[in-house]
Amino acid sequence: KEFRVLHTTYAPGGQNPKHYHPSHVVFYVLEGSGVWQEEGKDPVTLKPGESLHVRPGMVHAHRNASTTEQLVFLEFVIVDKGQRSTVPMR
């Protein structure tokens, strides 16, 4: 297994379309405001210091809620060595 920490920055209005992760993922916001939406659930807005757990296989999308400020967050994931941590939806 590998423990990965991804440091991600979205420009104002930036987004990641629907996708899923093959393992548990925890998102932690460092700067800005982001909206995460799991399929079939209401959207959740996260601000600095807040986190969200996403279960394996849960289809979701996330975006920067601001049109003027960047969104910066950490993504914590444990995967099998060599395994992709994100699978896009087609």
Kindly label every feature range from the protein language model.
Residues 1-4, 61-90:
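Double-stranded beta-helix
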Residues 10, 40-57:
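Short acidic-glycine-tyrosine-enriched beta hairpin
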Residues 15-19, 37, 84-86:
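Short, solvent-exposed loop/turn elements at domain surfaces
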Residues 22-40, 48-50:
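Glycine- and acidic-residue-biased ligand/ion/polar-headgroup-sensing regions
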